[in-house]
Regions:
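Aromatic-acidic/polar surface patches that form glycan- and anion
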Residues: 10-14, 49, 139, 152
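Short alpha-helical interface patches
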Residues: 15-21, 30-33, 75-76, 89-92, ...
Length: 173
């Protein structure tokens, strides 16, 4: 007999680590800190599970996400606006504009301020909405993911070894 324990737990990194890595490793060209959170969406008669990415403009630039319509207010700290992907906008609103419409994400009312390009469902980072990174920027708050873009010619394995050798220092400073 064998038994197993399954878990869908994810582990995160502290927000300040992205900047610290870039500042201490010239091999890193750019970075983005983000969080992807499953949310319960309520709008009109629609109730469904959606994914919200909390990120800043560096994430949009690094991942080539474009604003199709609307503004960038959803990226401002403390904003009550969100962006919706083209796919989710079509699913929820058909041919009508979602801009200015109110949605409820995990019991928090938000206004749709922009439509952005999405990745469909082919990515493990799929998302339906995007909002600001309104979280504490503390070393002991571990809930973020960090993407890094390496400079041309950098060996990722060598950089990983270098980063691992210095990692405890990065966290404990």
């Amino acid at each position: 007999d064998s038994s197993s324990i399954a878990s869908n737990r994810e582990f995160g990194l502290p927000y300040p680590l992205g900047k610290r890595l870039k500042d201490n490793h010239p091999e890193i060209e750019d970075y983005a800190v983000f969080n992807r959170i499953p949310n319960r969406l309520y709008t009109g008669n629609v109730r469904k599970e959606v994914n919200l990415i909390s990120a800043d403009s560096s994430f949009m630039n690094l991942m080539h996400i474009k604003i199709v319509a609307g503004n960038t207010h959803f990226m401002m700290k403390g904003s009550k606006e969100v962006a919706i992907t083209e796919q989710m906008a079509e699913e929820l609103y058909g041919n009508h504009s979602p801009l200015g419409k109110e949605v409820e994400l995990d019991n928090e009312k938000r206004t749709i301020g922009a439509i952005v390009t999405g990745w469909g469902k082919h990515s493990h980072l799929n998302y339906d909405f995007m909002g600001d990174l309104n979280y504490p920027e503390m070393w002991d708050f571990h809930m973020f993911r960090i993407l890094i873009k390496l400079r041309e010619g950098v060996n990722p394995d060598e950089l990983q070894q270098k980063m691992n050798a210095n990692f405890p220092k990065e966290i404990t400073d």
